[in-house]
A protein has these predicted regions:
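Helix-coil modules at protein/domain termini and other flexible surface or pore-lining loops
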Residues: 1-185
Length: 185
């Protein structure tokens, strides 16, 4: 673990963690115990989703989940891939078990949704080529992991609103970012 210096007096330091064997970098803002714990959590989250996803069998979307969820996944994959709905509906995806944030029940989902490597679900990459860990969380407590997942999900939705609208609710002063007119405490 390393602590990176501040970019300027108003910016926080960063707690950074690297795993040279697995090439899994992670970081969090700050140098408090909470930020160090955050960096460790990010590290385990990335390590898990890059290196430790173990898939189950292969199933179609309608074999692994309720019809309403399968329909939603079909529409999402249709929007982000160049495949037809029929190709999506008939494809057998590698599966993993996950928690549904809305019902808190376990269900199977396509492994390509959470596996960040290009090997685990190689045959499924054409359906979901750009992946991240949005809505995923690592924690020693199941309840805290679910809460973290919900926060990750809300963070993504907020970023999407910002990107789609092209404006933020609050503008950060350039004087704060550059350190101009900074008064030390």
């Amino acid at each position: 673990m390393a602590m990176s210096p501040k970019l300027n007096r108003n910016m926080p330091t960063f707690s950074q963690i690297w795993d040279y064997e697995r090439i899994t970098p992670a970081s969090a803002a700050g140098e408090t115990l909470k930020s160090i714990q955050g960096a460790i959590g990010e590290y385990f989250e990335r390590r898990h989703f890059f290196n430790e996803i173990v898939t189950g069998g292969q199933k179609t979307l309608y074999e692994m989940m309720p019809p309403s969820a399968a329909k939603a996944f079909t529409e999402a994959f249709f929007q982000i891939s160049s495949l037809t709905r029929d190709e999506i509906i008939t494809h057998k995806f590698k599966t993993v078990r996950a928690f549904n944030l809305f019902s808190l029940e376990q269900q199977e989902i396509p492994a390509v949704i959470i596996a960040l490597d290009n090997i685990t679900a190689a045959d499924d990459l054409k359906f979901y080529p750009d992946r991240d860990t949005c809505g995923c969380s690592f924690h020693g407590s199941l309840n805290d992991a679910i809460e973290g997942s919900l926060c990750e999900f809300m963070e993504r939705q907020s970023l999407l609103l910002y990107w789609l609208q092209g404006k933020a609710n609050t503008e950060i002063s350039s004087e704060i970012v550059t350190g101009i007119n900074h008064i030390d405490e």
